[in-house]
């Protein structure tokens, strides 16, 4: 199956956000490291950069936005889950051009590929609750 440029952008953004969360390195350093160590030709670079930079610059706001829908303390989140939720929350709040169903599906696929065994179920549940508020108009 051919992977879309946006999916590749999300996968690399996830790697970048995870790296940034763990290392606390400057986001430009993380971005440069990813760009030099990956084939970026089939990646939607603008989308990758928007996700990576958007999460890095708005992490606290994104965390506060998704927190009511988690059903557990944010400190209990696995680092991959946190990164996926931050990316998806950014997309839900800032990328109105992307349908919420696409955002949730992509987050689930990231969780299946990179998360713990049941992460995708948790991600799905949290985001499904979040869209009831964050994308209320789209759901009606």
From Swiss-Prot:
HAMAP family named in the record: NusB
Native source species: Alteromonas mediterranea (strain DSM 17117 / CIP 110805 / LMG 28347 / Deep ecotype)
Gene3D superfamilies listed in its UniProt record: NusB-like
Record function comment: Involved in transcription antitermination. Required for transcription of ribosomal RNA (rRNA) genes. Binds specifically to the boxA antiterminator sequence of the ribosomal RNA (rrn) operons.
GO molecular function, one term: RNA binding
UniProt family annotation: Belongs to the NusB family.
Stated name of the protein: Transcription antitermination protein NusB
Keywords associated with the record: RNA-binding, Transcription, Transcription antitermination, Transcription regulation
PANTHER family: ANTITERMINATION NUSB DOMAIN-CONTAINING PROTEIN, N UTILIZATION SUBSTANCE PROTEIN B-RELATED
Spans through the membrane: none
Lineage: Bacteria, Pseudomonadati, Pseudomonadota, Gammaproteobacteria, Alteromonadales
GO term, biological process aspect, one: transcription antitermination
CC annotations in GO: cytosol
């Amino acid at each position: 199956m051919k992977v879309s440029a946006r999916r590749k952008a999300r996968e690399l953004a996830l790697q970048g956000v995870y790296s940034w969360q763990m290392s606390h390195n400057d986001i430009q350093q993380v971005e440069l490291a990813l760009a030099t160590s990956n084939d970026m030709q089939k990646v939607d670079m603008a989308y990758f950069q928007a996700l990576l930079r958007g999460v890095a610059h708005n992490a606290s706001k994104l965390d506060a936005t998704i927190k009511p829908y988690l059903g557990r303390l944010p400190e209990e989140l696995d680092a991959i889950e946190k990164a996926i939720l931050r990316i998806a929350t950014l997309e839900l709040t800032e990328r109105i051009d992307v349908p919420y169903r696409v955002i949730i599906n992509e987050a689930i696929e990231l969780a299946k590929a990179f998360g713990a065994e049941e992460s995708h179920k948790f991600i799905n549940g949290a985001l499904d609750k979040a869209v009831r508020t964050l994308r209320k108009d789209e759901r009606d």
